[in-house]
């Protein structure tokens, strides 16, 4: 059951994730994207070791960080915009963690929007990726046209 708009609190935790990035995760992602870029397919990256495609970790974590919360507490919605800031390479074998939060809610031209954000860090707390996404919140009785 969606939380009423007036009761949505800025700062609410939307989810958390902790994962260790493996070569297998990178390989599966590259295969799905039909990519063999040498920075990601081997150890030829400027970082000196195998790195993950920049958007891999946010995609792996999307459900735990945002989607479960949105489906449970927000209800029908459409992604309105999304932006990543890639701050440091994510390397194979790296342990990564993030906490998702509701950081903004607003109304524009009679429509309601929420913004969610997660900062991915390594075990030492080094910022790796900032994922920020805005969702258009649809009315609870919204139905897809047949």
Where are these regions (language model features)?
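Hot-dog-fold acyl-thioester-processing enzymes
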Residues: 1-81, 142-146
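HotDog/MaoC-like acyl-thioester-processing domains
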Residues: 1-5, 86-146
């Amino acid at each position: 059951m969606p939380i009423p708009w007036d009761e949505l609190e800025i700062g609410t935790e939307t989810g958390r994730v902790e994962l260790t990035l493996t070569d297998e995760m990178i390989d599966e992602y590259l295969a799905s994207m039909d990519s063999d870029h040498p920075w990601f397919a081997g150890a030829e990256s400027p970082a000196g070791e195998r790195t993950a495609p920049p958007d891999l970790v946010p995609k792996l974590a999307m459900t735990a960080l945002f989607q479960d919360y949105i489906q449970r507490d927000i209800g029908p919605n459409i992604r309105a915009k999304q932006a990543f800031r890639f701050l440091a390479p994510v390397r194979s074998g790296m342990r990564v963690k993030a906490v998702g939060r509701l950081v903004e809610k607003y109304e524009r031209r009679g429509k309601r929007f929420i913004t969610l954000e997660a900062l991915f860090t390594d075990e030492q707390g080094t910022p790796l990726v900032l994922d920020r996404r805005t969702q258009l919140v649809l009315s609870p009785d919204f139905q897809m046209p047949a």
